[in-house]
Regions:
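Short basic helix-loop element that most often maps to the first helix and adjoining turn
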Residues: 3-22, 47
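Conserved hydrophobic/aromatic packing and binding residues within compact polymer-binding modules
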Residues: 5, 19-20, 30-33, 59
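Short, charged recognition helix plus adjacent turn
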Residues: 11, 60-71
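DNA major-groove recognition helix of helix-turn-helix/homeodomain DNA-binding modules
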Residues: 24, 43-58
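DNA major-groove recognition helix of helix-turn-helix
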Residues: 34, 52, 60-63
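Short, basic-rich loop-to-helix N-cap that marks the start of a DNA-contacting helix
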Residues: 37-47, 68
Length: 71
């Protein structure tokens, strides 16, 4: 999961500070999410999935299909 977060961020040409702002956390906190040293709250996972237009299942590694769910 953590590698997917980094890959998505890099694919969107973003730095950790930019993504941290989306989540309203510090860059240090986001860095810890991305490295796996801090568990990501479910609200942050949902926010990341919406931000990247993907599903939480994709972020968690439960699927390899990055497409979001239909609403």
């Amino acid at each position: 999961m953590y590698q997917r977060l980094r890959n998505l961020r890099e694919d969107h040409d973003l730095n950790q500070t930019a993504v941290a702002r989306v989540l309203h956390v510090s860059q240090t906190t986001y860095s810890r999410y991305e490295s796996g040293t801090l568990d990501i709250p479910s609200a942050a996972l949902i926010a990341l999935a919406e931000f990247y237009h993907t599903s939480v299942d994709y972020l968690l590694g439960l699927t390899d299909d990055p497409k979001p769910y239909r609403k």
